[in-house]
């Protein structure tokens, strides 16, 4: 079985295939978080606001307590894309990062901070400081505007997964991805003879576990536990793929082996999520947990891009 990361430059999509199965699908912006040497072309002194030219014919809005003159060069980062008739928003307090550290130009006295769950890495710490100084020194050069650093999510993803091959493809014509996208449209999804129903609501996500057509000669309690156990990885795989977070309630088949089931859940959830909290079973027999949100669900993203 093959594992690799992929990119579709046309759809600005990227993600990972693990053992010939879609693990995640994301989308990136070609401008958001890029760092530029921009040129001040206008200003409003009363509100410390500046209008910057950051690319050919492209302007952005910057608010800064630091004073600039028209014609000055400013090192800044796009933090909000242009939308309808509104200009993009830039910040002089740029953020740079690698897989271990992140750094803001002005916060924390300009020193890198270790990312949650990462181990100290002297080489990556120094690399970030060197990059910061290099970017700041760019204010002294010409011409402006100039793109200095692309810093979209795809770049960071490639850095994080540098041990995997990067494959360029068309997500619409790749069978693994297109089949997964079709699945995401459905609430009821199957794993062999078993199934789950995913209802992703505004306030929570409710998942119903079904044995469907599966038959067994096992004791009923053992059979229900086995069905629940067999679906644990399938449930968290689909929550991760669909990028569903927040409160999650799972209606497992009723079994007396809930403690064993919680142990299995703890083993499996770590493969897909870093930040979560397990509350356990309620008096009504429903299993509750919360997962840290990571932006819009994949279903909403696909709908916005008219891919479903």
Which residues fall in each region the model found?
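Beta-strand/loop nucleic-acid-binding surfaces
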Residues: 24-29, 51, 57-68
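Conserved catalytic network of the ASCE P-loop NTPase/AAA+ motor domain
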Residues: 30-31, 43-44, 67-69, 189-190, ...
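Short nucleic-acid-contacting surface segments enriched for D/E, G, S/T with interspersed K/R
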Residues: 33-35, 65-75
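SH3/SH3-like beta-barrel fold
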Residues: 50-54, 76, 88
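Extended, charged alpha/beta regions that create polyanion-binding interfaces
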Residues: 1-34, 79-203
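Short aromatic-glycine-enriched beta-strand elements
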Residues: 12-13, 46-52
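Conserved glycine-centered short motifs in functionally critical loops
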Residues: 50, 82-84, 94-104, 192-308
């Amino acid at each position: 079985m093959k594992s690799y990361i992929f990119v579709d430059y046309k759809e600005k999509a990227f993600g990972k295939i693990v053992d010939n199965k879609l693990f995640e699908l994301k989308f990136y912006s070609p401008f958001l978080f890029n760092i530029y040497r921009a040129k001040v072309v206008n200003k409003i002194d009363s509100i410390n606001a500046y209008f910057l030219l950051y690319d050919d014919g492209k302007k952005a809005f910057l608010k800064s307590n630091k004073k600039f003159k028209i014609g000055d060069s400013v090192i800044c980062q796009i933090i909000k894309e242009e939308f309808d008739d509104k200009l993009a928003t830039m910040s002089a307090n740029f953020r740079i990062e690698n897989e271990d550290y992140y750094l803001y130009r002005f916060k924390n006295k300009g020193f890198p901070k270790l990312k949650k769950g990462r181990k100290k890495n002297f080489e990556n710490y120094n690399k970030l400081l060197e990059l910061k100084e290099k970017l700041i020194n760019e204010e002294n050069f010409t011409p402006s505007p100039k793109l200095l650093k692309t810093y979209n999510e795809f770049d960071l993803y490639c850095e994080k997964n540098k041990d995997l091959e990067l494959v360029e493809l068309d997500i619409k014509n790749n069978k693994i991805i297109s089949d997964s996208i079709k699945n995401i449209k459905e609430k009821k999804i199957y794993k062999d003879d078993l199934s789950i129903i995913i209802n992703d609501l505004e306030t929570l996500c409710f998942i119903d576990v079904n044995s469907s057509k599966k038959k067994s000669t096992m004791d009923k309690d053992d059979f229900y536990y086995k069905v629940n156990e067999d679906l644990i990885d399938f449930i968290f795989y689909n929550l991760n793929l669909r990028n569903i977070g927040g409160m999650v309630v799972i209606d497992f088949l009723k079994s007396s082996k809930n403690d064993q089931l919680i142990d299995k859940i703890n083993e499996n959830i770590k493969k897909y999520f870093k930040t979560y909290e397990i509350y356990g079973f309620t008096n009504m027999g429903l299993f509750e947990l919360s997962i840290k949100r990571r932006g819009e669900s994949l279903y909403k993203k696909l709908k916005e891009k008219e891919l479903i």
